[in-house]
Amino acid sequence: QYLCREGEIIKDPSLDIPNFRKSRYLPRILSEIETEKLITAPDLSSAIGIRDRTMLEVLYASGLRTSELLNLRYSEVNLQQAVVKVFGKGAKERIVPLGMEATAWLKKYYEESRQELLKNISSDLVFVSSRGRQMTRQNFWHIVKKYARLVGIDAAISPHTIRHCFATHLLNHNADLRVVQSLLGHSSISTTQIYTHVATTRLKNIHSCHHPRG
């Protein structure tokens, strides 16, 4: 392409290479049953277990990016209306519903666990580490991997997988693509459309496995 622009050659030879353009990556998606197993894996007898369960509930209910979840502050959470105010890429603000289940877990975490984790440290962050500090992306990645292994999910799972599940499961239940785009904070609908391909692929797999002539 550079040589073409500079006038050194007439035609870009890379155009003759089959499938030169990289195909779009289809993300790994957990089934709804697998997602439920992952979310309910934490041991609720400890403050850390309640925190982890709450983080997984909020992540699946809202589809937040990992950075958005870890930077979430209580001043941005409205438990009465069950919504969070999120500042995403480019500092774009959006309002995301939490649903009843995630809201209930946030209340439980706040009332029963958060103060124990804070250890007298003052912080407006919703989720903190076992030392009362801000949790790192790597910390949360290890948490998700730990629970995935615990419930027998061997695939390459990360916190972002749960965001993928959020979008795909909504579309599987006939959510409008534009609404999903808004919830995810995508600036372009083409970014969101990848999930329609994932949903279609899953439907084809189900058909092929269960239909007598599949």
Language-model features, listed with the residues they occupy:
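Conserved catalytic core of the tyrosine transesterase superfamily
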Residues: Q1-G214
